[in-house]
Amino acid sequence: MKITTTILFIGLFLTGCVDDVPRDNPLDPESAGYKKEGSVNGRIIIANQSSGISGAVVRNSNESVSVTTDSSGHFSFLKLSEGKHSFIVTKQNFTNDTFNVSVQSGSASQIVRGLNGAPIVTFQQILTRKIDQYFPSPQYFVDVTASVSDPNGIADLDSVWFGVDSLKYPLTYSVTTKNFHATIYKYDLPTNTIQYLVGRPLTVISRDVNKAVNISAPFFITRVIENEASPISPSPFVDDTVSADSLMFKWSPPNVTYNYSYTLSLSRVDAGTQTVVWSLIGLNSSNESYDFYTHPGRPMLLPGSYVWTVSVVDDFGNYGRSKESAFVIK
């Protein structure tokens, strides 16, 4: 009994001698310096995919602070005050995204957000065409080609147009070439001439199913070929009947100073319908004639009616084609 009383006395004595424990630890909820803070960790990905988006800017609107996602799309905000926080995500060629997070004291919120990417034009080209003819007048048109992709997948693409000034012309997708294409004739343009396009900035406009729009960097027409080569022989004005074993194409060259090559084309005519039976591309501009029977793998030409043409093609791919020259194989 005496031992128990002694221990109790000592305990009471020590308790009375010890001051209150200081509470200045900022991690101690009872401390005056304690701050109710949490964190937000997240990842920005391409919508409908698992690929992270690097270089996206995530901004905390409450505290006016921003971070940039790493190569895998991850980001972190530390020491955020407890409560609701608003964020906005921006990235070039992606639709902005906003979201809210309720930050809890002492905890880390995990967030994953998917961004919708606008379409991307990876290739764009416009080539001019002139088709000379006896009647009614030369035909002029342009071929527009564009390659367009979408970060969210090709199925996300909705529409693609060729744009000039306030005008838009729809482009059609080709399964064969995997490109979008349109042929625009001079009568489709305000001045009834493709010269209307010369010097004007041209664009490809694309839109996805979520209505995100991309307008390409401007591109321009390089040249309209007005001076084409002229067939000399065979010709209905010289000798329209040719032996099957002596077909020699002759023409006069164009009066131009730029680099170019020739394309020759031969078609058979049956009841007014033309069928291309032979062509030669990339013939050097130094040539002014070509012996058909020296061409490897040439087709056998049966007796009948034919027409041939010679086109001038510049280094960009623009071309001007001659009038058709008719003849007969006997």
Regions found by a protein language model. Give the residues of each.
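Structural motif
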Residues: 29-54, 151-152, 315-318
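Extracellular acidic, Ser/Thr/Pro-rich low-complexity tracts
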Residues: 144-155, 210, 251-258, 314
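Short Pro-Gly-centered beta-turn/loop motif in secreted/extracellular proteins
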Residues: 76-84, 92-93
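Short, acidic Ser/Thr/Gly-rich low-complexity loop/linker segments typical of extracellular
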Residues: 63-74, 173
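Glycine-centered loop-to-beta-strand initiation motif
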Residues: 42, 69-77, 178-180
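Structured interaction patches on ligand/partner-binding surfaces of diverse proteins
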Residues: 92-115
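Short, compositionally biased P/S/T/A/G/V-rich stretches that sit at domain boundaries
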Residues: 20-26, 115-137, 219-247, 252
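Short amphipathic beta-strand segments in non-cytosolic proteins
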Residues: 43, 56-68
